[in-house]
Amino acid sequence: MTRFILPLLCVLGMATPLCRAGWELYPPEFILRGERDSLQLIATWRDSERVADGTRSARYVTDDPGIVSVSGGGKVRPRSNGVTSIRLGDSRVKITVTGIQSPDPVSFRHETLPVLSRLGCSAGSCHGSPHGKGNFRLSLRAFDPALDGLTLVREELGRRTNPIEPEKSLLLLKPTTAVTHEGGKKLDEESPEYALLRSWIAEGAALRKEEESICTGIEIHPSEARVLHFPDANQQFSVHARFSDGTS
């Protein structure tokens, strides 16, 4: 019985007797603020028989590739200030890019620590274990930013973060395996994560920005229940954080 719920809802919401097949892009519009911002698109195919995620197989078209780039997996990154659209079938996302020439300083709490968590550095099996690894300890999943700031900036005579020569920081040398790292390679020198960590170090490895906003909530899309059927049994998610200054 479950398999007929989505088609029935679609029929009730349309004036025509059958659902119109096509692509839906989410979100309908978005603002990218600064060169480090990014957006994960969600591409959904709907017809009278199924709802399927096509985020990683869809062929996106960017009206102005000079303003944004979009990967095959639906990841959008800014290139220059302006307004453009990304299209898929009849669906369209309006993208506005601002702040490329004057990026905000890297936030230790909202950018540096999340990158380290995503790389697995603060996981319980790595430096987030109770005693750390290799004389380097981070709080588990960055629950204690003050402790993490101390170990990253103050310990090891400042060798973990070197603002004068950022590339020689152990925080970059270890995960790229430029020097021996028991945990193996975690970071690519050409990746956005490497660029962010390098920028944070080059800016002086600041631990707090003045009047820094706080996260007030998150939104996960798709938010509605979905029944996925083989072979279309995968689903891409996007998570948007909302901050106290009104940005997301």
Regions found by a protein language model. Give the residues of each.
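Aromatic- and Gly/Pro-enriched helix-to-coil junctions and flexible linker segments
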Residues: 20-248
